[in-house]
């Protein structure tokens, strides 16, 4: 679906909010949770009424990273539901003031706190990355 009109304009009727800052990063089971905001936030009050995204990066198997992006959690869960194999794998998670790192086998994910960017590595070789306008929500 085309929602952009050229490179910098949006089509009429669409409001697009891109992640611009990793405001908060919290370590969770098997990974970390990022609260991404569409603009630079200096305090929690600035987040009211904005299109904040919760992005969970987790890993339950070696060299596999699961990414879940949520804008609104309130919904009826009608499935489908599948039983996933859990081998008890625990990735290495490091959260610092500047970045969060998830290491699962030979795969590494680095999320920057200063501006919105994430990079995937495999055996210390850069696979792919995302930054400005890579993650967002469309109304």
State each model region's role.
Residues 1-139:
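N-terminal accessory segment at the very beginning of proteins
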